[in-house]
Every structure is written in structure tokens, then in C-alpha cells.
């Protein structure tokens, strides 16, 4: 018996490296490494099979400028079967609360170490941004939140769960963002590209101010970026912003970065990438006489598209975005086919299904002919994904001046023309109307996560969704049927928010944290 190995050694594990949890939360270098983990956690919203959340957030679900075919988060897109037990809504909640939990650990650890250390202070500020940003994203979707700013320990596992007031939530968001703004730098070295800067934090702070109708604050934050954010400027052409695999250009404030290098593709397998490109790319390769081709976007699922209402907002003769940001026509590309090189007629499928999936015009913003150039049938992409860019900052500042000073505001007109004139349109001299600004938001920023919160913030989400969401056969004669269930099922006062995930209600107790009233 004495010769048998003891369990004692197994009960006293020894780390084979210096990187332990204690190291990560108790040293400046450890906190700096821990913050990098927040970037990875944030990017997971777009990774691989879990990327539905990013598609829903960015591709204008339940708005007036998108038509949905099938597949990705169908219950959210159509609203006819959306319930509190929806898995995507659960994932959205847990994703952001996971970020909040990790940020809480970093923030408290940094404060315990002392913020006099520059490395510690920077880690603290970045964690503050991520926490404030996560709460803001959650509030826009759910409104009813549990507010927590402390790390979870064995001493506080039992908690008093109760919904925080809107005032409490916004005070927390604003406080976190203000702390980040006060600490973060305008410029970062090239090796740190992709990390949060003062400009990113100010952009989000301006968004928060717009919700509060604090237009003076929104204007200040935006114009600080225009004046002091010297590493940012508008690209000469709109299409230049999205051209290439690495979207490292002067207009991008923040992007999720992807790489085909080992470890550059996110969680899961080392080369997971994301699927936004194939979800928004027409399934052209399924047409007889066609094959996978990088120049047409590679692999396409054909699930989410711009609709006819959006296309109708462009001056097709003058506005360069109409041609440069979309693919409107497809061509037979199999050299063995007799029709090789000819345009595929849009009415190929007549009254039968096929057009929406295989021939519908598509957005090129997430189109990827770069990372899949040698493997166009690959079902993932490694093209960077933009989160915020300067064009939104300018239009947000335009809107703020409009609300404060009216449609003849010289500043509102100046900022409106930053995107409008760049696209080849004759300069607009005003006066502006709210509809003009909303239309320019759509033309410039479709499929960039702007439309849904914009319409909700202005109290227009229900009206716009009921009037224009999806497409009817009468609006697009090539369709086989209507694709506009959101119009029929959007209930005013209910679908402007998501239900609290049922699992979370069960965990916290309905008596402590009840379901939102419209979803009871």
C-alpha cells in the first residue's frame, strides 16, 4: 500500500508558466494581458456559428431597409415566433454580461493596485469602456437590466436581484465612458491598432447623449473627434472604406480584426473567421451555369439583403453608392456553359422561388473577394468587421445640430454634406428635414448597426417597420411571394424591446426580476 502513488501531488497543481489568474489580476502586466481578453470576448459576437448576434445587430433587422429570406435568427427577423426562450436573445444577454463580469474584475483589481501606474490606469480605462459599452448595448435591446459593478466571488453569490432604473443604468454608462475618455489617448502606435482610443469612447458617449436628447453634449463629443482625432479622416470614396481584407483606413474608428494567421480567427477552431460575408452574399453559385468566384463574393447563403425601399432612396444616376456599395447584376461564370459571360436575367425563375436566394441585389459592405481569393467556396471570411466609423459621427453631429438649431443650421448642413457630396451628389444647401437626414443615414450606413437604434430612439421604429420592412411582391415583381412578416407581426409597445431571456428570469426569480411588461 505504501508503494502506491499518492493523490497529494494531484491536489497541489503547479502552473507551468508564470501566467496564472492571480498574476492576471494582481500585476500591471497581468491586467494589461487581461484587457486583451476583453477584445477577444467582444469579437466573439461575430465568430463562426455564433455570429448570428452580430448579423442581427448590424444588418438592420426589423427596420425599413432590409429584406430577410431565411435562416439566420429567423424568429427575430420575422417576429411571428419570437419568445423569451429564444436562444439568440439568451446569447446576446450572456455575451454582454460576460464582458461586464470580466471588466468588473479588471476594474476592481486595478483600483486595488493603484491607478498611479500608467499600465494599470490604461487597463482600467479600457475595461471601463467595455463595461459601459456592454451596458449600453444591453439597455438598447432590453431596457430592464440588472446592474452589477463588482466581481463575482464566493462571498457575494447570493444577491438581491432587482431591475435598475433607467437613470441608474445611464449614470453607470456615462460614468464608465467618461472615465475612459479622461484616460485613453487619441493616438495609438501601429502595433496596438484596433484598441480603444479616446475617439471611440467619445463616439459612444455621443450616442448615449443622443438618447438623452442632450444635443450640446453630443455635438461636443463629435466635434472633439473632428478637431483632435488627427488619425481619423473621411476616405475620398465611400467604397474605399470597405475595400480590402484589413479595413485599416482613416475613416474606421473601431473594427473587429480577423486574420488567417493561427489564433487570428476567434474562438472555436483556430481558423473560425466569421460568416457575415456569406450571409449577405447572394447564393449566385447555385444558378445553373455558375460556380464559386471570388469576384462575385465567393460562397453565398443569400439570407439578408437591402430592400427596394432602400434602393429607392438613391439617385441612381448621380449617387455613386448605388453602384459601388451593391451588386445589382450577376453573370454566368462557368466557362463550360454556353451562356458564359452573359448577364443572368432577373426574371429567370418567373413566379417560382429562386430569385431572392440566387439573384437578389446584395450589399458589398461585407463582401469578401480578398481572404477567400484562392478558396472562393470557403464558408467563412477573415475580412475585418467595422463597428464604428467617422461617417456615422458626422451624421450624428448633423442630426444633433438639426434637433437643437433647426434645418437651416449651417453646421448641420456642413456635416450632412460630408457623406452626401462625397457620393457625387450636388451640394445640399438646406434647409434640412428629419426625413432627409434619416434617408442619408440609410444610404450611407445601411448594414452597419445604425438603423434599428436610430429609429427606436426617434420613436419611429414601429411606423417604419410596418410600412417598409422586408418586401412585397407588389414592390419587387421578381419575388415569388411576400417577404414581409415583420410588417404583420410588429406590435407597437412590444417589439421595440426584446424579452428578458427566460433562463435569466428563472435564475434570478420572477418575483425579484419579472419579465418586461409587454412580454408577460
Give the label of every model feature segment.
Residues 1-3:
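Conserved small/polar residues in nucleotide/adenosyl-binding loops
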Residues 7-10, 67, 96-99, 172-174, ...:
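Long, intrinsically disordered, low-complexity segments
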Residues 8-69, 178-181, 198-346:
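An aromatic- and glycine-enriched ligand-binding surface/loop that stacks and positions planar moieties
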Residues 32-46, 68-142, 164-168, 177-189, ...:
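Conserved, well-structured interaction surfaces
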Residues 215, 407-409:
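TPR-repeat structural position
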Residues 309-389:
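Flexible, polar/acidic helix-loop-strand segments at domain edges
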